[in-house]
Amino acid sequence: MRVKQARVPPLPEADISPELLALLGPRFKAMPMLNIFRTLARAPKAFKRFMAWGGYVLSDANSLSARDRELVILRTGFNWRSGYEWAQHVRIGLDSGLTEAEISRIKEGPVASGWTDHDRALLQATDELTQDAFIADTTWQALSDLSEKQRMDLVMTVSQYTQVSMMLNTFGVQLDEDLVLDPDLCKGAAAL
């Protein structure tokens, strides 16, 4: 975590309008409201738009497989040192077909041994997007097993989770009670 306490404190769940609660959908209604949503609810109009776009990225409308999507999201969160993003998506990644060994290896990126060419290309593209906001021609060609729509969804997924990571880090969104901070995400981060 970049900061030890929230800069933008999450709203108490009781203070969130029924209209905003309805945006969460069935997936999130069965659990306590996550800190990310309680924080973003402080900007209700933005929260509504965020949920629509984020809903696309996490839905079946995103043409990446759930496993590929989570591989990319986890690498994006790790690159931006977003402890909250990483912790939330480790469990989603496991549910989407990533193994614990693969999740650990994501931290090493595309240079780690054990990746398929497909996974390596996804990780390389993610690294290039988070470093330069561009995918090099050689990496674009390495993604040739993806359709045009899948390549577009790859870029849109990295861009969405870049934005999410920036908000989480800057607003100081703290981990939900059931999450554990990965110690590798503390390295090099200045805790305020």
Where are these regions (language model features)?
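Hydrophobic alpha-helical segments
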Residues: 1-192
